[in-house]
Amino acid sequence: MSNKINPKRREPTAAAAGAGATGVATNTSTSTGSSSAGNTSSANTSSSSSSSLSSAGGGDAGMSADLTSLFECPVCFDYVLPPILQCSSGHLVCVSCRSKLTCCPTCRGPLANIRNLAMEKVASNVKFPCKHSGYGCTASLVYTEKTEHEETCECRPYLCPCPGASCKWQGPLDLVMQHLMMSHKSITTLQGEDIVFLATDINLPGAVDWVMMQSCFGHHFMLVLEKQEKYDGHQQFFAIVQLIGSRKEAENFVYRLELNGNRRRLTWEAMPRSIHEGVASAIHNSDCLVFDTSIAQLFADNGNLGINVTISLV
């Protein structure tokens, strides 16, 4: 089974009609941010913090839940976790918000680099809810486990898996396919574990991508072919498959991509990416099927490139 996938440049949205399917492409750029934290000094906690805590000792679940409110950041309402810094009046703010502030959000005083050691000690005995509790996570964690859990939490919101950065949607896994069908109607879905992904007009200049969905084994997979210019004047194609699901679910599958023609064969086999991981990092690290334009021409037919895609259970 095959369907033509027309290219779509990576610019806002432009879909062209194909033989029952269209592709999606947008101009992409990657930006990275960095932050730095200044040196901190240790000091005794202010009287306001320590007096609040002295009457709230204990470690049962109910008291732990009550104590978490003491760690709420007044700016983002996330939790302030060690290392905990306070202003000269004893007010707390989380590290993320602190880097964006010039004064204490509570008293407008200066942001001193003073460690609140008493609150840090209390934090080690308090269990915090996962930040994705609003999406259904019921985990209760000590602060040393919180960040690691949240990075892989099965309840954390999924980003739109479509290539490019134009779509800002995010939501629970069970709404991803609904989002794709409603907001990305140009993407066609083919049924079966063996299909042919036919990308049209591969000779178009610039950054272009082709996208198709494949449905089998009760799951949905997104097939992505991107053409990028990683180095000046050197264009490359990157082909990869991602599962609309978690990494744990992705471990149950393996995909195989194959270019075939003119007595030549080029193959790639790997575990599909999960949409939590996305495809950007894999493409950046060339952890996918990679070939340049000269190789593409060996397998292309009148500017169209067919890729055999096979999904298998492990």
Swiss-Prot record:
Domain of life: Eukaryota
Matching InterPro entries: 7-in-absentia-prot_TRAF-dom, SINA-like_animal, Sina-like_RING, TRAF-like, Znf_RING, Znf_RING/FYVE/PHD, Znf_SIAH
Zn finger region (RING-type): 73-108
GO cellular component: cytoplasm; cytosol; nucleus; ubiquitin ligase complex
Top EC class, one word: transferase
Compartments (UniProt record): Cytoplasm; Nucleus
Renumbered zinc finger spans (SIAH-type): 125-185
Residues involved in Zn(2+) 2 binding: C160, C167, H179, H184
Pathway: Protein modification; protein ubiquitination
Subunit description: Component of some E3 complex at least composed of sina, ebi and phyl. Interacts with eff.
Stated family: Belongs to the SINA (Seven in absentia) family.
Official protein name in the record: E3 ubiquitin-protein ligase sina
Lineage: Eukaryota, Metazoa, Ecdysozoa, Arthropoda, Hexapoda
Annotated gene: sina
